[in-house]
């Protein structure tokens, strides 16, 4: 009987450890991603070395390799958090907006610029596809739906299919991206002599969608 009790206790302990291991792994994986999110917000993309992320997370410099096969995989997981944040902000402004498609798209574009200027490090990482594995870790699942929202709004504002809405949306996105970058670098405020980005936002929308009735 004592031997049987000992075996039972040992088996129970092993099962408990096995159950704890996936939870612990998930926790450490999440901690590495969170460390990267904090690091990119504070110091920018250039700070996201494996060693620095590990130091920020309080783990050994070799620990990230246990959870992310490559550096790009870890950067992609960090960028996914950025896309999720942008998606949440977008949903918040659109869900409570019953205005016209043009008004909704204006709110979407404004949210995009606000995100770019308030989170410059994360914003840069999200679109640095030379640093990311976009076909892994669900990155496309979080990034492409955002673009589709833009395409759908463009299609409602501009029913013409020549060029198709996806092309117009792509050109509009590229223009907004350029405005965000040049504004963040200080080039556009200097060139325009203004500290108000709103006129540039509206001019960008007018250029791709036609003038808005005012």
Where are these regions (language model features)?
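Helix-turn-helix
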Residues: 31, 35, 39-73, 77
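Hydrophobic alpha-helical connector segments
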Residues: 77, 91-122, 165, 169-172
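N-terminal intrinsically disordered/low-complexity leader segments
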Residues: 1-27, 213-214
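Amphipathic C-terminal alpha-helical segment
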Residues: 125, 173-191, 206-214
